[in-house]
Amino acid sequence: MSKPLSNYLSEYKWTTLIVVNIATFLAPLDTGIVALVLPNIARDFQTGIDIAIWVSVIYLIVLTTFMTSFGRFSDIHGRKKYFVVGLGIFVIGSFFSGMSQTIAELLIFRIIQAIGAALLLVNSRAIITDAFPPEERRLAMSIHVTVIYLAIATGPALGAVITEYIGWRNVFFLNVPLGLVLLPIVSSKLKESAKSLNKSMDWLGSFFFASSLSCLLIAITFGPKESLTSIDLYIEEIFLPMFGNIHFWSRFAISIPLLLLPLLSLVFLIIFVIVEYKAKNPILDLRMLSKNRLFLSTNLTALFMYTSHYNALVMISFYLQLIRLIDPTEAAFMLSAFPLTVVVTSIAVGKYSKLVSSRELSALGMAIGAISLLLMSRLTVTSSVLFIEVSLIIMGIGLSLFAAPNPNANLSSVTSEDRSLANGMLGTMRHLGQSLSLAIGASTVGLFLSEDIYSVGGSISVVEYVGGLSQAFFIGFIIAVIGIFIALIRGNK
């Protein structure tokens, strides 16, 4: 006897949630692991810290510039298909990242890995939202957020153990067997979404959007530590021994006027806006942003939330290891207080969030996050470990109040056929915020440091670093306060 349709749908929604969460777990796990092994990568490749950090930055740039495009592409051609494709690309990128013999190879394969991660992340929340009825979406999204932050919490500790015992390359190889096991499961368990065959891809808009964001992020990342007139990039040699010692440049140098990249970013942005208003099926529906106040505000609050706090774990990690001389493994477990707090509190938020509007929860989360950043701005060389842990826990509580209600309100404010696009736009704001946060944090701290810190083995001034760290957290506090007001003025429907 066949099962009633209601039972089938009930089983499918939970199966979907489990399968999507397990597959999506790999991307944030990788992000958390890689952030911890950057010093080892710099040491092995004999490259400067300012270059090695691009192993993380370039990953975020790809996510930022392509998530919206991939969201529209998945709306047109099917979300399940490109969720599976994304998992496959992520596995391939992970394998070759582990095989990299130069920093150039690693950066190239991190781009490939990030393309796969973008396809996974842009479709995950849309697939979950499609599977659940409106009254259960907050709970489903809270579980999804819990899984993501469980991965982030696991990443640093797992990365520290793997690096210490079997080497940093294995943090990339870890994704390969897990991904290969998941591929047939995802393919067989998920249903394909309805396809919007009457829509076309906006490739021109994608190009100008990616160009504008890339120019902006490069300018912020490199500009403050360079001269007041130009950004100077020196490339002695880039080669790929894996592919027969192919040489791209030899003793090549380029000097970019400091104002050129921001100006190019503005020009590309203006062209992008013009293109989007004329496009039949734009990747960024500016009309939807202008007509849907809830959709606009949820995107803006996400941008301000992640810009304000995302650099905290990276900055505190360096503080613990360089200033307090704490072992990397111990530091990793200390840092896990933040994501573990999100894991513990997110389920409770999802269960009781029906009693409070997403507007109030988002604003409260931003406010609590702002308090934690204000506390961190008082950090000194002699601050107790308890002070740091309490600050991270408060930040985790703030993010848990924000992380599920905000995307749920965002995706519920659009029609089903636009949910991958909406999730892509929200993901773009999230990753743009993360990229800006890292760039602002590194630039602020860099202004307080001498030049030799950017070289492997360079010395560091304790007072200079902590002074820059405090200023970076205070800037984050100001950004969070602005985000509170944006959250409060939005509508609930």
What are these regions (language model features)?
Residues 146, 150-166, 214, 218, ...:
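A gly/Pro-rich, aromatic-decorated transmembrane alpha-helix motif that marks the paired
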Residues 127, 161, 189, 218, ...:
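A residue-level signal for alpha-helical anchor/packing sites in multi-pass solute transporters
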Residues 13-62, 252-260, 278-407, 415-417:
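Transmembrane core module of solute transporters
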Residues 24, 60, 141-149, 153, ...:
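Small-residue-rich transmembrane alpha-helices and their cytosolic helix-loop interfaces
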Residues 164-300:
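Hydrophobic transmembrane-helix bundles of small-molecule transporters
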